[in-house]
Design a protein with these regions (language model features):
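N-terminal loops that bind phosphate or other acidic moieties
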Residues: 1-112, 116
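Residues that scaffold, gate, or flank divalent-cation-dependent active/transport sites
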Residues: 120
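Conserved small/polar residues in nucleotide/adenosyl-binding loops
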Residues: 126-128
Length: 128
């Protein structure tokens, strides 16, 4: 039963990056929308889910306080980790034997593309 906003999923991410709580929260919230919340296994949303990111600041980098180049680099790395984890969660979902990725191109907006992709992967008539 994984169809997040978020659903039956626990994700714990740690980093030694020096980043403010506000920037870390912003990065995680935006990334969860584009990774975990796009996963569906059976179309049912459950209530047991959580994603936590902890940063201890020990990397020695300049503190990330703004949405600058360092912040974008952090977001890119966070996206790579969360994308990999989200795909693993889908692949390991109850009864999963295949992993399908739906890519929508040339959409008018990201929101439209997401709605279309969710409609396609949510169809019970698709047989792979």
């Amino acid at each position: 039963m994984i169809h997040p906003n978020m659903g039956t999923m626990l994700s714990f991410i740690t980093t030694d990056c020096a980043i403010t709580h506000e920037m870390l929260t912003d990065a995680l919230q935006e990334n969860v929308k584009k990774t975990y919340n796009r996963v569906t296994v059976d179309g049912d949303t459950s209530t047991n889910d959580m994603c936590i990111v902890l940063a201890n600041g020990m990397a020695g980098n300049t503190l990330i306080e703004w949405q600058d180049e360092e912040y974008q680099a952090f977001c890119k790395a966070l996206n790579e980790v969360n994308t990999r984890l989200a795909r693993q969660i889908a692949a390991d979902g109850e009864g999963a034997t295949k992993l399908v990725t739906c890519t929508v191109k040339n959409s008018r907006s990201e929101e439209t593309a997401e709605r279309l992709a969710k409609a396609v992967v949510g169809l019970s008539l698709i047989h792979i």
